[in-house]
Amino acid sequence: MIMPFHLAGMSLPISPKLPGLLRSVVREQRLDLNNLSTLTFNFRSPDYSAETGGVHPVELRLIRGLHGWVFDYITDFSYQGLGQDAELCKELDFNLSCDEHYLQGWGPLPGVEARELFALWQSNFISYAQLGYFTVTVSGE
């Protein structure tokens, strides 16, 4: 199964390892991509909780374009609040399709800051995934 990605013109620096990771997930889950136009990947660490912290959950969405799969958004979630009032909220939101990026507590991020933060986040995320911290579910439409 071939899963081409179209990365030209992306506002953030996508490492070749990230599409490789997503291809591996699709292959492992034996997904049939023929009739799908979107894929949503949910990466969850079973040990992550409001009390103990841990590796944040991540949602990543791809859209099928004319020249391959394109990144729509990548969102990193974290628990905010204390005790029973803690709720899972967006901490980092990289909207690649519209070049708008957000960090909780800071608000919208200018391009240079977004690129630097994304490069660091992406490196950590790929490392955590390769180390097996996540269970992954994929849904498609």
Residue ranges of each PLM-predicted region?
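Generic secondary-structure transition motif, activating predominantly at the C-termini of alpha-helices
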Residues: L22, V26-R30, N34, S78, ...
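Amphipathic, interaction-prone secondary-structure segments
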Residues: R30-W69
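N-terminal domain-onset segments
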Residues: M1-P46, G132-G140
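An exposed acidic His-Trp-rich patch
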Residues: L66-E116
